[in-house]
Amino acid sequence: MFYKLLLKKNNLDGFIIPHEDEFLTEYTPPSSDRLHWITGFSGSAGMSIINERNAVIFVDGRYTTQVKMESPSEFFDFEDLSIERQKKWIRENCKSGYKLGFSPKIISSTKFKFLEKIANEESIELVECKNFVDQIWLDRPNEPNGEIIYHEEKFSGKNFKDKKTNLLKVLNKEKVDSLFISESDNTCWLLNIRGH
């Protein structure tokens, strides 16, 4: 299959495909739903590791039935998304010297620390690379670029100014100088904006 050529071309033994997008959101737009495109699985939480011999999809308990209906069992193993099951699968399928590729743009720091820890324990090399799916997804939908709209106070419950004032009170009480908000849904909530 095509993925074997990409693995060989990039000198990798396997590649990680998480569900999350560049904003690490649970609900991704169609243009960022890489896991769905490559596996057929349409749930909102999961991760796949694909290598030359086999592949796995990790999903949480909400999706154990759904993943078996949507993804081909002749190609994918199905596992629980728990850290222990991920460790077990990696230990059994990624031997010493294994080169495991990942796109740093769509892996959280928490996930990276987990992968780094198990890579060190098992002598696996983590390799930053371009996203495999993006290289082969020729009919990928366009990224959303709809206009930003104001979410009226009658829907949000509070205007931005009041939210900001309350947030500053909490920061002052906790003696915090600043707050970095990286999740887009939190930014939208604070600013009372939405988009499509």
Q: Model-derived features: where do they sit?
A:
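Ligand-binding face of N-terminal immunoglobulin V-set domains in extracellular IgSF glycoproteins
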Residues: L100
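N-terminal accessory/capping or targeting/presequence segment of soluble
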Residues: M1-S96, I107, K111-H196
